[in-house]
Amino acid sequence: SNRQNRPQMPKDWCPFCPDPSNKDPHKKVPDHFDVLEYDNDFPALSQNPPEPDDVATDFYKVRKSHGKCEVVLYSPDHHGTLKELSDEHIRKLVDLWVERFNLMKKDPEIKYVFIFENRGDEVGVTMPHPHGQIYGYSVVPKKIELELEAAKEHHDETGECLFCRMNKEEETCNLRIVHENEDFIAYIPF
């Protein structure tokens, strides 16, 4: 990974903003876009990863960090936020996420695709422009693996889908639901 080589950007310039005055033929951001995806210039994962440092022990294991990292620009508006986007614009963003997810999952090396918003100093964001990332990992994170194992065990024991049961329980008690419509339900976990 070469993430430590990320540059500190001047405060009055943003590489994610459209800039018609920039005539560089290799620039990543076009003069006009609604939503945009491109490969991260400073990825944490690589489709051609180098051999890991020889620091493994019998206890601590290392492996190549195979994967893919993409940047997704939500809008050309430098000061906009995801919550301020119109429904139509959010539809374009979600469609792009689905497209990229479907392309990434075709890589047999990628076992888990993670789409997330990249915002705030707390998570180490160096660019304030509204954007997210899509990571394709060569391993399923342990937390997700454990959740899937629990769901399978529940199904094996009861014959029912764990997540469907959780949804029914939340609808019944109606204490933690954030939003619900005919297509989905969002709630704070118990």
Which role fits each region the language model picked out?
Residues 1-129, 135-190:
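Active-site microenvironments that recognize anionic phosphate/pyrophosphate groups
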